Design a protein with these regions (language model features):
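A short helix-loop-beta-strand connector motif used in the catalytic cores of GNAT acetyltransferases and
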Residues: 46-57, 75
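Conserved GNAT acetyl-CoA-binding A-motif
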Residues: 100-112
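Conserved GNAT-fold acetyl-CoA-binding loop/helix
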Residues: 20-46
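A short beta-loop-alpha structural element at the N-terminal edge
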Residues: 5-20
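A short, internal acetyl-CoA/4′-phosphopantetheine-binding micro-motif in the GNAT/acyltransferase core
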Residues: 75-86, 110
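Conserved acetyl-CoA-binding loop-helix of GNAT-fold acetyltransferases
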Residues: 87-100, 118-122
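Conserved beta-hairpin
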Residues: 54-67
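Conserved acetyl-CoA-binding loop of GNAT-fold acetyltransferases
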Residues: 121-130
């Protein structure tokens, strides 16, 4: 990751860009979700979810948001990286910050997103439970994960 990438708290004026990153990331990694559901979720992200979490984002030297995480009550509720910046350590940096600075120890991941599951397993999380539906009651199973070890 470039040394010019910084972690910072996004402002309300960053919300439209956060939503763009969220949607691009979801479309790149959640191919099991129909378009109409992504559109519905996008509205929830903008109108409810961003305000319900403590946010941190990675910005580059041009102040573009490369990825972001949201934590509430010891849980990573959001971690999304723009597709063109995946594999560059952005998600790892955001997750490690969420764990070390925001006391995150739990998260849920879509069962149908094996790349995210592998990432969280690599970062020291383990699956401890499963639900048949997502947070809105739709048939997209979630795996419940908890931190069992920290990585360096």
């Amino acid at each position: 990751m470039s040394p010019t990438v910084t972690l910072q708290t996004p402002h309300l004026s960053d919300y439209p860009e956060l939503v763009r990153v969220w949607e691009a990331s979801v479309r790149a990694t959640h191919d099991f979700l129909p378009d109409g559901y992504i559109v519905l979720l996008r509205e929830h992200v903008l109108r409810k979810y961003l305000d319900a979490v403590m946010l941190v984002c990675c910005k580059d030297a041009r102040r573009r948001i490369l990825g972001f995480a949201g934590v509430a009550n010891g849980r990573v509720d959001m971690l999304f990286v723009a597709p063109q910046y995946r594999g560059q350590g952005i998600g790892q940096r955001l997750l490690r910050h969420a764990v070390s600075e925001l006391n995150a120890e739990r998260l849920d991941v879509n069962e149908q997103n094996p790349q995210a599951l592998g990432f969280y397993l690599h970062e020291g999380f383990e699956v401890y439970g499963r639900s048949e539906t997502d947070g809105l009651g739709q048939p997209y199973p979630l795996l419940h994960m908890r931190l069992v070890r920290t990585t360096s």
